[in-house]
Amino acid sequence: MKLGSAIPWALLLSTXTLVSTAQNKGSDDCGGFLKNYSGWISYYKALTTNCVWTIEMKPGHKIILQILPLNLWTIEMKLEVRDQRAGPDNFLKVCGGTTFVYQSSSNVATVKYSRESHHPASSFNVYFYGIPQGAKA
């Protein structure tokens, strides 16, 4: 194989690796600031009772969140999703049940997990990705 034909393949393979690793980034820490185009939030640590994650996409994009079925109790544990543009009184509170899909109206959304300290932590998974404002999920 000539060196000239090997370079495009090397570039292609390195690009595919970069894309696949970027899409698998997420957070299992208690809170944080996520600016990836896609990722996940997962929490299962027992000590912290309140965690807040802020997800930010590029301007002109909105965020799609897929919240997998939860095993949280309504009063003692909850997961809240807030949309930056919607205002402080407009949020989704999820306590359990089926899979939820939430579409933000702006490029910033906040996910908050809270529980009473006398209850053990319950794991959950939230997947997110960004799409252009005019696109449908």
Swiss-Prot record:
It comes from the Eukaryota. Glycans are attached at N36. Residues 30-131 form the CUB domain. SMART domains: CUB. GO terms for biological process: single fertilization. Its main location: secreted. The keyword Signal applies. One of its GO terms (molecular function) is heparin binding. It is found in: Secreted. Seminal plasma or sperm. SUPFAM superfamilies: Spermadhesin, CUB domain (SSF49854). Disulfide bonds join C30-C51. PROSITE patterns: CUB, SPERMADHESIN_1. Keywords: Disulfide bond, Fertilization, Glycoprotein, Heparin-binding, Secreted, Signal. Residues 1-21 form the signal peptide. Pfam families: CUB. GO terms for cellular component: extracellular region. The keyword Nucleotide-binding does not apply. Inhibitor of sperm motility. Belongs to the spermadhesin family. This is Seminal plasma sperm motility inhibitor. It comes from Sus scrofa. The gene is SPMI.
